[in-house]
Structure formats: C-alpha cells, structure tokens
C-alpha cells in the first residue's frame, strides 16, 4: 500500500517509475547511498546541527539542480489540472481515506463512475480491490458508504435500468441486494468483478506483478508514483506502455536455445517478457468509464456470461490447467485470472507439418501483439527477399508508398551494431482527407529488427508509429510486429499483428473514437500491402517462366486474418476477397485518425450507417406520399369522367363488318328495345293502377264529406203568426 508517513532517507524501490526520472536528474558524482530529500519538501542549506551542516554541504551543492527540478515537478503535479484528472496515486489515497477500515494490504485496482439505486439515485464511484467492492457517494454532504467483501457475494447479475437500458449490475449477498446503475462500460466492469470474485472464492491471490499490470492497464503508464512506494513491481511488458530501455535489457533471440514446443511457447519475446498480460477486456478498462462508448464486444468468457442481459452468475470454480507451466518460466506467476491464454502462446499450428525448425522457434518465441492479426499469408518468395522488399529502399516499397500518396519519405540506414539487433527511423508525411482538420500529418516510425543469427532467414521487426498534427496525438500511438518465417528456399510466411498503445488514459468516448479511426486505417493499410505482395509474387512467378495459375493454388495458402483480442470481440467475420475491398484509407499502419479514400474505393464506401438509414426512411416516405397522391387523383378523375370513359369505350369498340354481325347487332338492339318497352309498360301499368287507387280514394273522401240538405217546409205554422 502507499505509505503517506514521512520517512527521510528512505531508499526508492529499484523498479519505481519515478526513481528513473530522478536518477536522470542527479549528477554522476552523487553517491548512490546519499539520502534523498522527501518529495514536496524544500532543501535547506543550513541545519540545526553543525555536524549535519559539514557532512551534507558538499552533497547539497552537487544536487541543487536536480532538487529544484524535482520540486518543480512535484509542485506541477499538485496544480489545478491534477484535480480534474487525478493520478492513480491520488485515487488510491482517496480510496484509503474513504475506506479506512479495510485491511492495509488492500490496494485500488480500478474505479468506475456509477449510481446506487435506492429511494433516489445516489451518484458516486465504485472502487474495486482484490477482495472488496466499495461504493462512495457524497450528495450535498449526504455521504453513503458501502463495503462488500467478495467472499460474501452470492449472486452477480447484469440488469437493465427501467427494464430497457443495459447499464446496471446487481450484487447480492445473503442479507442485502445492491443495484448499481449508470455504468458507461457495464460489461467491462462486470467481467472484472466476476474474475476477482472467482479468485476470492477459490482463495487465490494475484501476484504483485499481475496486480500492477492490471493497474497499468486501467490507468496507463503515468501512475504518479514516488520513491515512497516501495511495493511497486514493474511488469516487463506493459502492453506497449514501456520501452525496452525502461523495462531492462533486450533479450536477444540468439541467447535462447530451443528446448521443446511446450517450453518454447513460454519464452519471453525480444522486447520483453509477456508474463502477467491480462485479457484485452481488462487492459481496456477505463477508470472514467462513465463517459462510455459503445462499447466493444466482450471476450469468450464474457460472451458466455452475457447470454442474456439479465444473466445470473453463481460461484463456480474454474477448471485448472492440466499442464502447469515450469516454475522458472514467465507464466509461473499466472494466477486464476488466466492472464496468458493458450491461443496467444502458440501463434500458428495449422502448418506444423511443413514448418521448419526456425519457424517453430520463432512462432513460439514471438507471440503476436494483443490487438489484431492482420496478415497471415504464405508467399512463394524467399525470406531474405521478402525482408528486402519490406524493410529496405526497394522499388516495391517506393511504389507502395507512392500508391499510398506518402511524401517527404526519409529512410535512415539500419544501425550496424549487430546484425541480430538493428534499428532505424523513418519519417514521412501522409495525406488526410478530413475537411475540418489538417490536410496532412507528419509521421515518425521507429523500426527494431531482431534476428536469431546473422545467417538466419527469418526475422522479426517491431514498429512504433507516432503521428503528429492530429487530435489526441499525445494520447496514443500504434505498434506493429512483422514476423517473417522462412519455410523453404523460395517460400516464406508473413505475419503482421498490430495494437493501439496509450500514453495517457482517455475517456471512453474519446477512446472509442480513436480505436475506430485507427483500426480502420490500419486494416486498410495492411490489406493493401497484402494485395501488393500478392501481385509482386505473381509477377515474380511469371518472370521465372512458371505457370502462375498452376502454382499459385498449390504454393500459396491464405488464411483468414484473426482477431487477437482474447475473443473479446466474439466471432470475427472472414475478410472479403482482396479484390473487392471497399474502403481504402491512407493512414494505414501509421495510425492517422483521418484517412483518405483510395482510387479503388467502392460506390458506397465510407457512408455512415445512420445516413443510410435516414435515406431509406426518406425514400419510403416519398413513396407513400406519391401513392397517396395517385389514389386521390384517381378517385377525382373517376368521379368526373365515368360516363365519358363509358362512351369512349363504346366508341372505340370494334364495328361489325359482315351481315351476320349486323344481324346479331340488330337482334340485340331489338331485344334491348323490347325489354325497354316491357319495362316502360310495367311502369305505365303501375302508374295507371296508382292513379285508379288515388281516384277511388278521392271519391270515398268526397262521399264522406258530402251531407244531404234538410227538406224545405212550405206551409206556415200557427206559431209563426203575429198576435
């Protein structure tokens, strides 16, 4: 653990990253046993004791420059921007302060931004150590702290927020259930928790080298450590985060003797040992995963765990390897995390029957990089000639660079210190098709060649490509490994693997943008290189007077490029035929984020999927509107021109030509006339009947209304006379 108590005169660990920087600032005359000042403290020229003044005055005069520079650097680390992007040391100190009741041996591995779902969402951070899962939230001084021991976890489950958004993890113990949501990279966090949980159940611990390797993969190479951190153990291979000068002497191929397939598969690579290398999932875990991207698919283990979004994982012991590694091999420190997979140890087993001893040695000693395997082809060209074509000022390389539109190409000669270990630097300018950014970018490529012996045909070339003048150029660079294996006199295999290495750990959104653009350019570059090598091979066979069609099928075997992400991306689709490549970007292996389409680009290359979807929706809407307009127009026309259509149809009919046809027409007309007359007769008859009924009704009405008049009396009555 980090020790924050002052210890003056305390020696720095030999593998501490800050010690190397401090030793470079010290003058050569400084004795190694001289006490070093504490970081962050000023060095006084005087002392309370006269004996200390006389004994230290000479040493202080020689290290004044180094002390000032070191103090300036320590003050810089505590500036305002360090609060916005804290280092791993600061995060670990915060972890120790927040969870002071944890054992002293617990060290922070990674932390994620998330929220705890209770009555309200409590936004905070989830801290993972080797044996504990901790959560801390502080909302307006309302603090929430949770500490869960991994051994007490009974169920680990992926969940969905509001049954829709897959960004939550549920952790259950015997007494409680904790629902954590708002993860930016839920699958990565789940996988890491699951593996640590299995380790805790199996009572297995990580070795210091594995632990620090995980920390480096999560936080990058700059951890902010000082000489006070004596428990730091530097991994020999940090996935490109350290150079051979920093991690130690380079292990030459000539110093390693072949001893067998099982032993050779566990030997270190020329740049350094690959022990303690975690799976690509863990290597890409971000400490600020709340900015998450779309994230990538998981490796084979995670794909089995993620059969459904709500899959529940129960503690099941992982099967142990049947063949343990030798105790002195680089894989002897591997714990239950399976940091070095069997697929990465053996690079090629499909052609073991025809491979020579040299190919078997190099394939076992030089595993591919952890990114992607881009070229795995056998060419009917000798290994020496293939090396000259790719790594010398050959006409093939010049023509290929011209096709990629590279300018200002400068190739420095190979260093002649040793034929087994050579080095050179290349500089050139690549075009960029980005309309908003720069139109070109300068590139510096450093190539290091390793060979088993001066007379050996095969070789390995490690290339580091730095692109300048592009966004986030100080965050990443690309690394490539060319492995040329001689199979026969005129037969060689070329394997090219690549990976993206980060100097600083970017946000997940920025990281996804970098990886998407870089991998697009890298894959296009090497696919183009593979096609050009195939053309050169064909030309070479034709010039030799051989039948190209008969020999190419038997002498050259092609393999589908594989993805070397530890099965993180799931099953890979086979690469299309080289002649039907639809995307060509000039950045290629040179890690330019913006690439220019090539001349053989297809008609639909480079179109975003969102634009295609929007175009399809617009076309469907236009078609529906056109159909609706046609139906309305048809109804209106039908309503106004029905009779005219009928008459027009009769007018355009076929006129009779013979007497028989005229007779038929007359008969039809007569029949039609008779039918019409009969109908009119019925109508008239019905009308007459109605009129008769009306007449009868009116007569009855008239009879009912008429009243007979009373008879008139002509004789006078006696009462009518006057008195």
From Swiss-Prot:
Segments of skewed composition (Basic and acidic residues): 566-576
Domain spans labelled GRAM: 93-160
InterPro entries documented for this protein: Cholesterol_transport, GRAM, PH-like_dom_sf, VASt
Gene Ontology biological process terms in this record: autophagy; cellular response to cholesterol; intracellular sterol transport
Biased composition (Pro residues): 28-38
Sequence segments annotated as region (Disordered): 1-63, 257-337, 562-601
Low complexity biased stretches: 1-18
Modified residues (Phosphoserine): 265, 269, 273, 418
Compositionally biased intervals (Polar residues): 302-314, 579-595
Domain remarks in the Swiss-Prot or TrEMBL record: GRAM domain binds phosphatidylserine in the PM and mediates protein recruitment to endoplasmic reticulum-plasma membrane contact sites (EPCS) in response to excess cholesterol in the PM. VASt (VAD1 Analog of StAR-related lipid transfer) domain, also known as ASTER (Greek for star) domain is a sterol-binding domain.
Protein's job: Cholesterol transporter that mediates non-vesicular transport of cholesterol from the plasma membrane (PM) to the endoplasmic reticulum (ER). Contains unique domains for binding cholesterol and the PM, thereby serving as a molecular bridge for the transfer of cholesterol from the PM to the ER. Plays a crucial role in cholesterol homeostasis and has the unique ability to localize to the PM based on the level of membrane cholesterol.
Protein name: Protein Aster-A
Source organism per UniProt: Rattus norvegicus
Gene that encodes the chain: Gramd1a
